[in-house]
Design a protein with these regions (language model features):
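Non-membrane alpha-helical secondary structure
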Residues: 10-13, 17, 34, 129, ...
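Long, low-complexity, intrinsically disordered segments enriched in glycines and aromatic residues
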Residues: 56-166
């Protein structure tokens, strides 16, 4: 079950605070803890958010898994057959899938909390096939909500594109260069 975030009219292209993001994400009726079998060490913010939400489509390219779905995805992708030959269970356990883009691509982070993007067209999973975004989970949420505002505005003027680029560079000065999708048409 996926839930589209339906917030009130956003100010155009404003980086959301963590409080604004938290109140925008749909809460689950139940809090789902991290299964005891999971040894990955999560950032507190990630644990706090995903254990209390349902899987949420912020935009089509930014789907945030609730803990139940994240656990199932990671359980499936921990199968060695998805990974480059010779990858060890130890190496696989250094990654956590926390979201998707709706087209088979995945959002994941490493044990340091850095966000990566995996394009399923790259076939086997391995660090070389993961694009480092040079952002953390909070910045990923801010990125997702910026694109949500941009897409919802339905106004793709040059002025709006410039505002979006400006806000993206506030998250991380290299973020535009690190985006995994070809956003040239929109920004």
């Amino acid at each position: 079950i996926r839930y589209n975030v339906n917030m009130e009219k956003d100010s155009l292209f404003e980086i959301k605070t963590i409080e604004q993001i938290r109140t925008s994400l749909p809460r689950s009726k139940n809090k789902y803890g991290i299964p005891k079998s999971v040894s990955f060490v999560f950032q507190e913010l990630y644990k706090d958010i995903v254990t209390s939400i349902i899987t949420t489509e912020i935009t089509a390219d930014y789907i945030l898994y609730g803990m139940q779905e994240a656990y199932q995805e990671n359980k499936e992708f921990s199968d060695i057959s998805y990974w480059v030959q010779g990858t060890s269970d130890n190496e696989i356990s250094e990654w956590w899938i926390f979201g998707a883009d709706g087209q088979g691509d995945l959002w994941l982070f490493d044990t340091q909390g850095k966000v990566f993007f995996y394009d399923h067209d790259k076939e086997c999973m391995c660090e070389e096939n993961f694009k480092c975004m040079e952002i953390d989970f909070l910045q990923w949420l801010q990125l997702a909500f910026l694109f949500r505002q941009y897409e919802k505005s339905n106004r793709y003027t040059n002025e709006d594109k410039a505002k979006l680029k400006n806000e993206l560079s506030k998250i991380n000065e290299n973020l535009i260069d690190n985006l995994p999708f070809d956003y040239e048409l929109c920004i």
